[in-house]
Swiss-Prot record:
Residue numbers spanned by region Disordered: 396-420, 671-691
Highest taxon of source: Eukaryota
Keywords assigned by UniProt, alphabetized: Lectin, Peroxisome biogenesis, Repeat
Name of encoding gene: Pex23
Database matches in SUPFAM superfamilies: Concanavalin A-like lectins/glucanases
GO cellular component: bounding membrane of organelle; cytoplasm; intracellular membrane-bounded organelle
UniProt keyword Cell membrane present: no
Protein role: Involved in peroxisome biogenesis.
Family of this protein: Belongs to the TECPR1 family.
Protein name: Tectonin beta-propeller repeat-containing protein
Length: 1350
């Protein structure tokens, strides 16, 4: 499951965090500042320091916060001067925003604070709607409020170009001071702060709400806070009722605000919506008991829960609070009444999913409220959280440990052992150190060393005079260098900047080259031993902080697990907690982290104990002796394995037919072989079974087939209709797949688990698949795998003959067709034996290719292609050899030597050599035939005439993969996209863009425990349902739900073809649950007005946010979110959300890898949720998860990425442009820069895949394109060749014409729009586009990965 963090502050003011994937507390690096109050949301901490000022801490971001600043330069054409800087009085500003309403001079655009740095200089954006512009970047139009184009025309009277520059938040993983209210911070300090608002209904993504309370009891709201603006803009005072002085405040995920007054009462802020985050007014809420002595001292707000603590240390729960409706309903905001809880509590914190954490009043320990669910929001009892603690040497708590330990030593590597063993190790005697405030450290003039023996700290004035060079970016240092710098920085000084700032910030003016010595930005001033922000003068004030380049990346903790400085201790001493913040943690009440098991030295298990080794050795020797016994089969079996039958009522559907009632029956017969582990394959080979579909009365059999014929069992449920599909290609035509519908989800899952289990046993496929397996996902998110090792076992493989497939022709008559899935590459041989009938006039053997398809404006032309035509003609006493291209025969070759005769048997061998076919008849060379058509384009064998076939053998140097006979085994989990490297590194991306790593297991929820491994983890995914509301305008009543007969449905999907409604939208299974109500989606592409409407001239047109005079239709999108709970052999990749990923084993790594170690490095790239590029370091066979992300900037937000075997990286931008990364090498794995690859006019791509078989891309019209003329000197190729999407040409149909996804490795595989798995055949260096598709089963597939398949 994903990892989340629980934060807490100790009585010393130190901040600790506890991960859901860990069982130990870790301390955030101590920088000399203590904290009195902390609050958290994912990746953001706000706190009140010991100086009563507000601080913000941004952590866990793999992608830095990077904002793009834009300024449009406008010019107008004048009759004499031409295009000039002189504008009309009614025109927009010379430098303006996109709409011209705001002046945006490049010399006036400043950094928001010292926590930001410029990332590059001003430069031109040379792109317009996916099309490149000229070098000067001008866009032309008739007038300013008009549509711009890249080309100048005779009526272009205005032009503009866009200047862009990026700024980056440089204070990651460090505390940054927020500007105080007054120039003197001590005039009105802060006493409380709260953050929330992550789930304000319909608010833009990344919205945050921050409230604070000053020492004067005033409520302050921080405007402009978001995930891209961690500090916000300014403090805004929010009036409170007369006589109300606030003491404490809390903000929920939906923006609901509760505040505690000094008199013990609480007030609630109402009217908090996406358009008004501050809210409208305050409402008073009575205390739990109307008694003068009972006062509320603390309150915490969740989504649908509010908890408070009174002055008698009792906890209370508020009933009736509904966070989603709190902004529009006062009753939902204030609730209905109080419920008293048992416990002695001093403070409470409610998480976003209403889980509750608290601190005890007497023992100051941390507790969790167990059993909190939506049905029981108050929970059951308080559970003590007991976890080991990592504390700093500077903590006074270390003195307790040192006195307990008796002065023994500790090593940095000791924490890598189990916590049970840690406590038994002797620890180094601790030294109690007093923590000096920052003011004291800064004024120190002595050369005292830090506690870890580092160099003397710099003086205050010396620190301000450090080099003004820009700090190294994230991509400029490797991980080891960055870690050394971070460690050295910790040794060098015991304090850090609370408001990191750039040394010299460049602000461009005029010609974009002038530098101000000190730009206007947030500059720290010393106050009460801390560092707080104030507005600095750009010229007079000096740059007072060196840029903090040692803290970046996603690590919340300095150095993560490696504590080489020895500054951290692991201990079990009791910490007195003063504050807990659960806003960033999400835990499942039914699957809690391992936080509650007390670790003691008595519970440790020594796996290397002598007694344990002795027992294991004896068991192994006994097993070896049993394996050598020859008479094991004569012993009577302890348990007699017999067959079993499982039956149930269901509904059966033939393809294209209706569902009808039936009885299904599964019969399993076990071989019951011995228990010898060495003969497990033989024992399972005897397993068998049958599946039968009977009539409702059981009298007639509708269909019956052996379980060995099943190639795939998958769920194909629809809303309210639980179904499974059984694929068995050996069934009669139009009988596969067999679809069965059940009465409930539980019954469907029961049959799915049994069928999957027995099919895996019959095919001897359990556990981890081979590294070169093909992975695939279905529309429902199920993960399947094809293991070629299983198919290899069924093909005779001899060193001299390669792989052999024997085709069953016992019941076949001519004309005979059979697919040759590997074509006829060099070394392939086709052997045909049979008998010619006495009355035969002629016989025919053809090696056929896919028909050449040409799409004309009003028709589709198919042209036959035959690579080899062997035609013995007995009536003419000759044999004809020929080829056909584009339905026309070429020059034929006649051979009067007759090797075939009527009434005689024959043996024909066609062997593909380097440049010709060698034809052998009756073991004698008959002739050869030079290639006229590429032999690799051959797809099938055709035999006709009066002939009886005996055998057909197909020999090939490579594995013969029959598309219809590929067995797809379900692996478990819920994944949308899958990526396989070929060396046991498999990644996946779920619907909510969470990255997952395959851990080598098998099983999950779909198997119900019948099979599988122990590496199963819970998985949670979220999905959003959309419904479109459509309206048409009429002159009388305006926009109404009344439509024309030719219009789309008034409630529909995005295309308007499918009727949808909010009332009839149902969940797919019982594992899904709604987590929101229907709401208007204001973040729809193209924008929307205040009511969520989009306008257009007519329905199949482009939509925009504001109504125009010619707009006659409008629509708006409604959304509702659901959560799916599943399980599978996957673990979370990282905290960062990713849109796409690419895994590739580079050719240079294969050459240098050691086959004995089998630890091959993998190039791993990904696209972050904001469109930036990430490269994952440390990914290899033994470490599939890798170590850390490194960020690579991009001017355009990207959506797709792929890596080739030579290391080349290709990406697709959100606007459809394609980019190529050049400069990548072993010494420079990140490359140098992006180079645009121009696409044909009007074409926008959405996905790309690179492999040994070429560079393939998928555009927005679901067409596939292949890059032509690729060479070593020109690796990006010259142009794109598009494959035609012809209706009714397989795999296309009239309604589904195109492809969903494509994957390129040594072969090219794709998923068609109708869910069929396809493999491209006939790909050669001369023809990289291939000639046609070989089709597999129609499993409603979604995504396939063949990058690792060889």
């Amino acid at each position: 499951m994903p990892s989340f963090y629980l934060f807490a502050a100790s009585s010393e003011g130190r901040v600790y965090t506890l991960s859901t994937n860990s069982g130990a507390w870790r301390e955030l690096p101590y920088l000399g500042l203590e904290f009195k109050k902390i609050c958290a949301v994912p990746n953001f901490l706000w706190a009140i320091g010991g100086d009563r000022q507000v601080y913000v801490h941004v952590h866990g971001l793999d992608v830095p916060i990077r904002i793009r600043e834009e300024s449009y330069e406008n010019e107008r054409w004048l009759p004499i001067e031409g295009f000039s800087k002189t504008l009309l009085p009614t025109d927009r500003y010379r430098y303006s925003s996109a709409d011209g309403s705001v002046e945006r001079g490049v010399d006036k655009i400043r950094l928001p604070s010292m926590a930001w740095q410029w990332d590059g200089d001003w430069h031109l954006d040379l792109e317009l709607d996916g099309q490149p512009l000229t070098e000067d970047g001008w866009m032309y139009a008739l007038d300013f409020p008009a549509t711009y184009s890249a080309k100048k025309s005779w009526n272009s009277y205005v032009r503009r170009r866009k200047w862009v520059r990026y700024r980056r938040y440089a204070a990651l993983n460090s505390w940054c001071a927020v500007a105080p209210l007054h120039k003197d911070p001590t005039q009105e300090p802060f006493i409380d702060v709260a953050i929330g608002g992550t789930c304000v209904p319909n608010a833009p993504a990344g919205t945050l709400c921050v409230w604070a309370i000053t020492a004067h009891g005033r409520a302050m709201f921080r405007t402009g806070v978001s995930k891209t603006a961690p500090e916000g803009l300014r403090w805004t005072a929010v009036p409170t009722p007369t006589g109300s002085e606030l003491a404490q405040i809390s903000v929920g995920p939906t923006g609901l605000v509760w505040a505690v007054l000094h008199n013990g009462r609480v007030i609630v802020r109402t009217g908090v919506t996406r358009d008004n985050l501050v809210g409208d007014s305050w409402l008073d809420v009575k205390t739990p008991v109307a008694a003068s002595s009972l006062r509320i001292v603390h309150v915490s707000v969740g989504t649908d829960a509010v908890w408070c603590v009174t002055n008698d240390h009792h906890a209370w729960f508020r009933r009736g609070v509904k966070g989603e409706a709190a902004g529009i309903s006062e009753d939902s905001a204030i609730g209905k009444g109080w419920v008293e809880m048992v416990g002695n509590i001093s403070m409470v914190s409610v998480a976003a999913n209403d889980q509750v954490f608290a601190i005890g009043a007497a023992d100051r320990c941390l507790y969790h409220r167990s059993g909190v669910t939506s049905a029981d929001p108050t929970g059951k009892k308080w559970r003590l959280i007991q976890c080991p603690m990592q504390i700093s040497r500077t903590s006074s708590s270390l003195s307790i440990v040192s006195r307990k330990s008796g002065g023994s030593s500790s090593t940095p590597g000791s924490k890598h052992q189990s916590f049970s063993n840690l406590y038994s190790k002797e620890k180094e005697k601790g030294v109690v150190e007093t923590c000096a405030v920052i003011e004291t450290v800064l004024n120190s003039s002595t050369g005292s060393c830090s506690s870890n023996g580092g160099p003397p700290g710099l003086l205050k004035n010396e620190r301000w005079k450090l080099s003004a060079d820009s700090p190294p970016t994230i991509g400029s240092l490797n991980l080891n260098d960055r870690h050394k710098q971070r460690t050295a920085a910790l040794r060098e000084t015991s304090h850090a900047s609370s408001a990191p700032a750039a040394d010299v910030v460049e602000v461009v003016t005029g010609k974009f080259e002038t530098q101000l010595r000190n730009p206007r930005a947030w500059s720290p001033v010393r106050s009460v031993g801390s560092v707080v922000g104030t507005e600095a003068h750009p010229e007079s004030d000096s740059t007072v902080f060196e840029s903090d380049s040692t803290h970046h990346g996603s690590d919340v903790f300095l150095g993560e697990d490696d504590d080489h400085t020895g500054s951290q201790f692991w201990t079990e001493c009791g910490i007195l907690w003063s504050c807990v913040a659960s806003g960033a943690v999400t835990v499942d009440a039914s699957n809690m982290p391992n936080w509650f098991n007390e670790q003691t030295s008595d519970s440790k298990v020594d796996v290397n104990a002598n007694w344990r080794k002795d027992i294991v050795n004896k068991l192994q020797r006994r097993q070896e002796k049993l394996a050598k016994l020859q008479t094991v089969a004569k012993f009577e079996k302890a348990v007699e394995l017999s067959s079993w039958v499982k039956s149930a009522d269901a509904r059966y559907q033939r393809p294209g037919g209706e569902f009808e009632d039936c009885i299904i029956e599964l019969e399993w017969v076990s071989s019951g072989s011995g228990t010898d582990t060495n003969s497990s394959e033989n024992s399972r080979s005897g397993d068998s079974g049958t599946f039968t579909v009977l009539s409702p009365d059981g009298a007639a059999t509708k269909i019956q087939f052996p379980l060995s014929d099943i190639t795939c069992v998958q769920c194909c449920s629809e809303a309210g209709a639980p179904r499974i599909a059984i694929h068995a290609p050996h069934l009669p035509v139009n009988c596969s797949p067999v679809k069965l519908q059940f009465s409930s989800d539980s019954e469907m899952e029961d049959w799915l688990s049994h069928l999957s289990s027995v099919c895996s046993q019959i095919n001897t496929m359990v556990g981890k698949p081979a590294g070169n397996a093909i992975w695939i996902t279905s529309e429902l998110g199920d993960v399947f795998v094809f293991d070629p090792a299983n198919m290899k076992a069924h093909q005779t493989s001899e060193p001299s003959e390669g792989y052999v497939e024997k085709m069953d022709v016992s019941t076949c008559e001519t004309p005979y067709y059979n697919t040759l899935y590997n074509g006829m590459p060099c070394g392939t041989e086709l052997e045909i034996s049979g008998c010619v009938y006495d009355d035969a006039d002629q016989i025919r053997f053809d090696l056929q290719s896919h028909s050449a398809v040409k799409v004309q404006p009003h028709r589709v032309e198919k042209h036959r292609v035959i690579a080899l035509h062997l035609n013995p003609r007995f009536n003419e006493r000759t044999t004809v050899l020929n080829s056909m291209k584009e339905s026309e025969w070429l020059d034929e070759i006649r051979n009067d030597k007759m090797a075939f005769a009527p009434g005689a048997t024959f043996s024909l061998k066609i062997r593909a050599l380097q440049d010709h076919y060698l034809i052998i008849v009756n073991n004698a060379v008959y002739t050869d035939y030079k290639y006229r058509i590429d032999p690799e384009s051959v797809t099938r064998l055709y035999v006709s005439g009066r002939i009886k076939l005996f055998n057909v053998l197909y020999r090939c140097p490579s594995l013969i993969v029959s598309m219809e006979r590929m067995h797809w085994r379900q692996m478990g989990g819920h994944i949308k996209r899958i990526f396989n490297s070929g060396v046991d590194v498999v990644w996946g991306i779920s619907c909510d863009n969470t990255g997952w790593v395959y851990n080598g297991g098998w099983g999950g929820m779909f198997l119900k425990g019948l099979e599988g491994s122990g590496k199963i983890n819970p998985m949670i995914d979220t999905h959003t349902y959309y419904v479109y509301e459509n309206q048409r305008w009429n002159p009388i009543s305006g926009f109404t739900a009344k439509s024309l007969p030719t219009d789309r449905h008034m409630w529909s999907d995005a295309t308007g073809r499918q009727k949808r409604s909010k009332e009839h939208t149902k969940l797919l299974s019982t594992h899904c649950e709604w987590i929101s109500d229907w709401a208007i989606d204001y973040n729809i592409p193209g924008g929307a007005d205040k009511e969520g409407w989009q306008y257009a001239i007519d329905f199949p047109a482009n939509y925009h946010a504001h109504k125009k005079l010619t707009d006659c239709v409008r629509r708006r999108r409604w959304m509702k979110r659901c959560r799916l709970s599943s399980s599978g052999p996957w673990q979370e990749l990282s905290q960062s959300k990713i849109l796409d990923a690419a895994l590739q084993v580079l050719d240079e790594d294969v050459d240098h890898s050691c086959s004995g170690e089998r630890n091959t490095a993998v190039a791993a790239w990904a696209i972050a949720s904001n469109g930036d590029v990430l490269i994952r370091h440390g990914v290899c066979s033994l470490n599939p998860r890798g170590d850390a992300w490194e960020h690579i900037t991009s001017d355009q937000p990207l959506v797709g990425i792929s890596v080739g075997p030579t290391g080349q990286v290709w990406t697709v931008a959100r606007n459809g442009m394609v980019f190529f990364r050049y400069g990548i090498s072993r010494q420079n794995p990140c490359g140098d820069a992006w180079q645009q690859v121009e696409a044909p006019a009007g074409v926008t791509f959405k996905a790309i895949s690179v492999g040994r078989a070429g560079i393939w891309a998928l555009d927005n019209q679901q067409r596939l394109a292949v890059r032509k003329e690729i060479s070593r000197t020109f690796p990006e190729g010259s142009h794109w060749q598009f494959l035609p999407n012809a209706a009714n040409v397989p795999p296309h149909t009239d309604q589904h014409c195109g492809f969903r996804s494509v994957s390129v490795g040594s072969e090219v595989w794709a998923i068609s729009l109708n869910g069929i798995i396809c493999r491209r055949c006939g790909i050669t260096e001369e023809n990289p586009a291939g000639v046609g598709w070989n089709l597999g089963i129609a499993g409603q597939w979604q995504n396939v990965s063949v990058e690792g398949y060889m």
